[in-house]
Amino acid sequence: MIAIGNIIADRYKVLKYIGKGGMQNVYKVLDLKLDLELALKTPLPGLESKRFLKSAKIAAKVNHHNVAKTFDYVEENGSIFLAEEYVDGENLEEKLRHFDFLDPHYGACILHNLAKGILASHRAGVIHRDLKPSNVMVSGGVQISNLKITDFGIATLTQEFFDEAAASGDLTRSTSGTIKGALPFMSPELMFGEKGKAIEASTDIWSLGAMMFRLLTGEYPFGVYLDAAVNVKTKNRMDWPNFMTSNPQYQNLSMELQKIIDACLNYDPRSRPTAEDLVKYCETLCYLSEKRFVGRVNNLIQGGISGFIDGIPNNSFFSMESVYGSKTPNTSDRNTVCYSTFEGHPCPRAHPVILWKN
C-alpha cells in the first residue's frame, strides 16, 4: 500500500486509495505538472508483466470520450504504474444497485456509448477481453453523462493472466476472484478455446451482449461462477423476461435491444456484429436521452392508475402506463422512482418511470 501524500516518479502525488480491482491497486493522484487528477494503477504483486508497457503504448493511441484515456507509464523502485483518466463517479455494477434493472431507454443510451468506445478501441487494435459492468465508469449521479470504459490499458496483462490460469488447468474452474468475476461475461472462445489461439475483437462483442443482458434484466444470461461456464458450454441461456415487452410503451425498443443482444451472444464469433455494426444500428434506435431525476410518489389518483411525483425542480404527473417493469410504485414501501420529464399542463409529465432503490 502506498502512503497518502507520497509522490511517484517526481510527478504523481497520492491523494487517496480507491481500491483493489481484479489485478491491480488503484489510487487517485494529482499530476503535479498538469494539475490534473488521475487514476494511478499498479499491478498486484506477482502480476507484473514485461508486456504491460506494450499494452499501455497501444491503449494510449485510443482517443475517444467513451474510453478512459491512458496518459502515462512509469517505473519506480521495481514497481510499474499506469496513469489513466480519473472518473469521479461509480461503475455500472454499483449503479445497478439502485435498480432491479434498467429501462430500455437507459439501456439503449448505454449500449450506444459502449459500442462507440469499443469501436474506437478496436480500430486502434486494442481488444479489452474483460468487459463487464465494473469496468465501466459513469458520473453525474442518476445521469449517464460521462460513460468511460476503463482498463483497456491492461488488456495484455489480462490476456496473460487468463493464459496462465488456463495453462495450469481448466480456466473455468479457477479459484481466482478475477476469473470468477469475469466468467458471467466471458465468451465461449475465451473460456474453452484452443490454447495459444489468438483472441479476436468478437470476444468483446459477446461480453458487451452479456453485460447488456445483465443491465436490462437484472440477471446474468448464463448465471455466475462455475454455473456460467457450464451453461455457456451447454448453451443454456436465460430467457428474456416477459416484462420487457408486456408494456406497449416499451415493447418496440425492448424488442430491438433483444435482437441486438441475441446477435452479440451468437456462439459463432464470425456471425456476431462488429462494433461498427452496433454503432450504426444504435443510430437507428429511437430512444430518450433526456435528463433523469429521482423523486417520491406522494399521491395516487384515478383508482391508482396515475399519480404525482415530488421531485426537483417540479412535481410531475405520471401514468402507470409509463412505469417500466413488473412492479409498480405506491405511496408506502416502493415510492422512490427515477424518471425523465416532458412539458405538460398543469405540471410536467414523467416518462419513463422506473423504481429506484436508495
Task: Please provide the spans of the model-predicted regions.
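Protein kinase glycine-rich loop
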Residues: 15-21, 26
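AlphaC helix of the eukaryotic protein kinase fold
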Residues: 44-61
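A short, aromatic-enriched beta-strand patch in the conserved N-lobe beta-sheet
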Residues: 72-73
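Conserved short submotifs of the Hanks-type protein kinase catalytic core
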Residues: 77-91, 95
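Activation segment signature within eukaryotic-like protein kinase domains
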Residues: 110-111
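Protein kinase catalytic-loop region centered on the HRD/HxD motif
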Residues: 116-126
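Catalytic-loop of the protein kinase fold
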Residues: 126-139
